[in-house]
Amino acid sequence: MSKGPAVGIDLGTTYSCVGVFQHGKVEIIANDQGNRTTPSYVAFTDSERLIGDAAKNQVAMNPCNTVFDAKRLIGRRFDDGVVQSDMKHWPFEVINDSTRPKLQVEYKGETKSFYPEEISSMVLVKMKEIAEAYLGKTVNNAVVTVPAYFNDSQRQATKDAGTISGLNVLRIINEPTAAAIAYGLDKKVGAERNVLIFDLGGGTFDVSILTIEDGIFEVKSTAGDTHLGGEDFDNRMVNHFIAEFKRKYKKDISDNKRAVRRLRTACERAKRTLSSSTQASIEIDSLYEGIDFYTSITRARFEELNADLFRGTLDPVEKSLRDAKMDKAQVHDIVLVGGSTRIPKIQKLLQDFFNGKELNKSINPDEAVAYGAAVQAAILSGDKSENVQDLLLLDVTPLSLGIETAGGVMTVLIKRNTTIPTKQTQTFTTYSDNQPGVLIQVYEGERAMTKDNNLLGKFELTGIPPAPRGVPQIEVTFDIDANGIMNVSAADKSTGKENKITITNDKGRLSKEDIERMVQEAEKYKCEDDVQRDKVSSKNSLESYAFNMKSTVEDEKLQGKISDEDKTKILEKCNEVIGWLDKNQTAEKEEYEHHQKELEKVCNPIITKLYQGAGGMPGGMPEGMAGGFPGAGGAAPGGGGSSGPTIEEVD
């Protein structure tokens, strides 16, 4: 395939989305199911690996081996409080592999474990394939988005996931920044405008304030809650119905994973309905111990169940305004991003907070981030169209960065919300006489003392010549690149001796070797998936050949044209093959092909005789014959129907 354009990928906690900028506009690409967003789910079964819709659709049957929310684990340590509290809610197993979380599943009868980066990379592979199928070209370059909140290690890990998936990640950009780009293109603003981006997705909530002037974006502040989103609203509804079930039937379904999962799916559907109707009904057959659960919920009740969560979305709005030193009257535009912003109550709360100001919903909230990422991808890969030429992107650091100085004080070198890329240098000195070295400890956070902030990494600068305290001059430099990845160096001015560290947040960055290995494994899994696909295709081919052959010889139009003996011969062989198929759903491709050859050996001579008996003239053929006849003339194995699109019903 020829090389395709760069794409923009919104790698979401619950759903992902991919877009491409071509012919002067952005196109959001639908997947093979026709959906413009794809669940960030990966499932492992005893025969195959599923990604996206296919994975989410079978989650009720296979909850322990269906992995989602990898974004909540990526770039974090196992003992991180977030990881520990999230684990309680997941049906799948998370294990501790030398301080790093891994997801453990049963795959093809073996226990396998994967890093969050690997799971995210599988979702990225899926998004890459969706784009390739649409463009008919290979896609190598992508811009991938992350929450504004992500720290360095999470950004780095997301980049690694891209590498494992075979993508060259042109840049990691903040989701709100991407939404702002989408918005900036839509609106072409001249004078300076302050824009508030309210992004409430399936799993995270981010509020950001940006200024846009002459096509230049600057992020003024970011706030939010990494743990609020559509799923939380679903959970409230699920708990409400579990309680209702208990009241009605005196039975507790909460320990039955499958029942809860089916209830959750119904609740998610009901929630979506409630954005456009005031009431939604829920009907689940045989939910628990044979009891059918038929009930309904009103929009008012749904709002009441989530009242505190909905109201709470305004706190980060106030915080981001404070950080940006802005009054709410100064906000020109409010942009809604994320599927949960379709909830009428949330729109109303936000609109009331801004004294009745109109909200911008012109961009589909699920797609705005991928839209902006696609534009950014076009810019970075040198798209010459005037729509994108005059757009410049400035991103910011979400937290202040600094080092520890005497007494455990946090000395900030780069203030939070500083536009990146950026570089800051400050001179420090020794604390005691003849001190031979200094320990440079790098922190991120807003507190005055380092013990309350987050340690990113540390290194020593040794070999300082003996001197009284306060004499040596040690120059510390913080340098952050456009991807938000930071280098910290310290140099002794007298000797020129230098040491540095790239902050990769020792939260368990993957080593080069790890990434290499994972890239190879990803290839291996892809090959296994392909083998599985071929296998299914041979099986379907054999099955359709046998059934078609059977219906062909049973067709009454052939009465008298085929001897009973031949007919019996074909039917017996077809039934034998169909019987074998029923017992061997997971045989090898070669076995299916072998059986097809055997079947063709019996059928072809008889069918050929039929043709000749019809005077060799197509006109003499019984109607319907050709249609019901798979791969005439001993079609090569696999030719019996696998050449066209093979559709199998999902049971």
Curated annotation (Swiss-Prot):
Residues 623-643 have a biased composition (Gly residues). GO terms for cellular component: cytoplasm; membrane; nucleus. GO terms for molecular function: ATP binding; ATP-dependent protein folding chaperone. Keywords: ATP-binding, Nucleotide-binding, Stress response. Coiled coil: none annotated. Residues 623-651 are annotated as: Disordered. The keyword Nucleotide-binding applies. One of its GO terms (biological process) is response to heat. The keyword ATP-binding applies. InterPro entries: ATPase_NBD, Heat_shock_70_CS, HSP70_C_sf, HSP70_peptide-bd_sf, Hsp_70_fam. CDD domains: ASKHA_NBD_HSP70_HSPA1. PANTHER family: HEAT SHOCK PROTEIN 70KDA. Belongs to the heat shock protein 70 family. NCBIfam families: PRK00290.1. This is Heat shock cognate 70 kDa protein. It comes from Oncorhynchus mykiss (Rainbow trout). The gene is hsc71.
